[in-house]
Amino acid sequence: MLSPRRVKFRKQQRGRMRGIATRGNTIAFGTFALQAQECGWITSRQIEASRRAMTRYTKRGGKIWIRIFPDKPVTMRAAETRMGSGKGNPEFWVAVIKPGRILFEIGGPEITEELAKEAMRLAQYKLPVKTKFLVKEEQEAAVEATAQTAAVES
């Protein structure tokens, strides 16, 4: 499972998830992608389960890119421990997800849209956030259309 090799600080505060993703929100490597529609934490186990589901369905054809990395430690206290005496130990790692973030990409000559859609659907079931299937050409056309409307307005 994914986790950082070494970190500057072992423990982190939980933080807040506000706003939308400004980075990692366009398809960069593959032809098809899975985009988050809401915010949340995705654990390294969930990422691995999604990756395995997609790989198994595509029969190892094409290539899968994981666009998120679990770099936030989540700490937990031992069961039946009294209050106080410091923060618990890191138990697992999560990736903080904002709406619009690309989670997975898939591509290759043997990957059709139907195959990619079904593989992404199987991965979707393993994730705790709502997601949306994207096609690179459609996303590029949408970005171009918004750029043209912005140019006309100004």
UniProtKB/Swiss-Prot annotation:
Key words of the record: Ribonucleoprotein, Ribosomal protein, RNA-binding, rRNA-binding, tRNA-binding
CDD domains, per the entry: Ribosomal_L16_L10e
A GO biological process held by the record: translation
GO molecular function: rRNA binding; structural constituent of ribosome; tRNA binding
UniProt GO cellular component terms: cytosolic large ribosomal subunit
InterPro entries referenced in this protein's UniProt entry, alphabetically: Ribosomal_uL16, Ribosomal_uL16_bact-type, Ribosomal_uL16_CS, Ribosomal_uL16_dom, Ribosomal_uL16_sf
Complexes and interactors: Part of the 50S ribosomal subunit.
Similarity section: Belongs to the universal ribosomal protein uL16 family.
Main function: Binds 23S rRNA and is also seen to make contacts with the A and possibly P site tRNAs.
Descriptive protein name: Large ribosomal subunit protein uL16
Organism whose genome encodes this protein: Synechococcus sp. (strain RCC307)
GN (gene name): rplP
